[in-house]
Amino acid sequence: MKILFITSTRLGDGVLSTGALDYFIRKYPEAEITVACGPLVAGIFGQAPRVTRVIALKKEYYALHWYKLWLETIGTEWDVVVDLRNSLMSRLIRAKKSYIWGRQDKQKHKVEQIAAVIDAAPPPAPTLWFNNDALAKAEALVPKGGPVLAIGPAANWPGKTWPAENFIELINRLTAADSILPAARVAVFAAPGEETTAYKVLNAIPAERRIDVIAKASPVIAAAAIQKCALYIGNDSGLMHCAAAVGTPTLGLFGPSWPQLYRPWGEHCAFVSTPETYDQLTSYPGYDQATVTGSLMASLTVTAACAAAVELWKRIPKI
């Protein structure tokens, strides 16, 4: 049995679709699965069982990447095609059964929207897979030695990045002697290009308790390292979804984005947001997303984030 699974080029959306892939892996354990996705998430899907091929789609002018994918897949008679990109290509190849992204209820979480496409109930939760090499690299990044608080202080847009000084204060509160993670080590995670923000946070942590995972790992290795941590707190980002997918208790910090769509998924997760909505944060005169250089999340207080983290931590054993 052959399955073609077409998913996102972006890390966050790609991770949110892993539950759908896992659904088909479990439903058809004999299947050979080809995944088409962006280069950034190719390593994540390459770890999955039953995935025999990953086609990394690099966006090209005139949508040539779709034409190239069509050339690579047209010669196969697919039993199932899952297209979460709603591409024309999935309609031009032979398949006995197709699941194609269409109009969705924008009030529902992305995981629920994906579940509706593939007729899965309950919605399959995102999940990640790791081979022995990935686990060994994660162990080198976050060695054993007591609980670790993982922090993701960056995001793909300055507007939805909580100020670095707030992260520093939050870390100090949560690792205080009378708090939930007294004297815990702190691992700071960030991707290449996010070093400036991330190092502001890392350098404020006592040297003996800091773990530097800034621009030092691919998404799949970073996710494996987060799996070793006791708690993850970070901005709305692909890394936040990785943390949730590996089962680490995850607190997402939201400002000018949509928690109803993109909050971290799972009972082991929570989110806290600015008092203002996306529209309220971005409706000021002269707003242009391309020219925003600073955080739009100043109204999310450290006290609110700390309270949400403590509440999440206290309810985890009850899950």
Where does each model-flagged region fall?
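Catalytic machinery of carbohydrate-active enzymes
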Residues: 1-319
